[in-house]
Amino acid sequence: MARPCAFLMVLVVLSYWSACSLGCDLPQTHNLRNKRALTLLEQMRRLSPLSCLKDRKDFGFPQEKVDAQQIKKAQAIPFVHELTQQILTLFTSNDSSAAWNATLLDSFCNDLHQQLNDLKACLMQQVGVQEFPLTQEDSLLAVRKYFHSITVYLREKKHSPCAWEVVRAEVQRTLSSSANLLARLSKEE
């Protein structure tokens, strides 16, 4: 009789923990991986940003989606997942591999892939728990438009070293913003 009771108690504790943390340890592992990805991005820099000032561009990062005070963690996870997926897609393109040190690029992409796995675990916990709000759909569309403008920019600049440096710096800001969003939300829990 003690074993079934203990088993039930474990299930109750685990389900409570899942409900409170969205079923994953995202704030700790994701934050550490994000910091490592930011460090790798910094190490990937090949040119001084000052030498590429003429190539700078505002890609229209959806900052209002990150700054929104009313955003909940459940809404932030799909947003950060889409950001991470788009960054990984950008840096695994054939044109990207020619622009960076292969070892650093592989490590960076591996970190992004691990972050995506963490985020997917959270998304799976959310499936069926909540509906997909229209504002969330708008956020994902804004992210896709943002990365489309980056892709178009790289094409227009013929994937030049300066264009990639501008994009690297932009992605660094984007990753930093997503990390700050998740850190803020984890403090609110």
Swiss-Prot record:
Keywords: Antiviral defense, Cytokine, Disulfide bond, Glycoprotein, Secreted, Signal
Disulfide bonds: 24-122, 52-162
Induction summary: Transcribed constitutively. Not induces by viral infection.
Record InterPro entries: 4_helix_cytokine-like_core (IPR009079), Interferon_alpha/beta/delta (IPR000471)
Gene name for this UniProt entry: Ifna13
Major site of localization recorded for this protein: secreted
Compartment(s): Secreted
BP GO annotations: defense response to virus
Name the UniProt record assigns to this protein: Interferon alpha-13
GO CC term, one of those recorded: extracellular space
Family matches, as Pfam families: Interferon
Glycosylation site list: 94, 101
One MF annotation (Gene Ontology) recorded for this entry: cytokine receptor binding
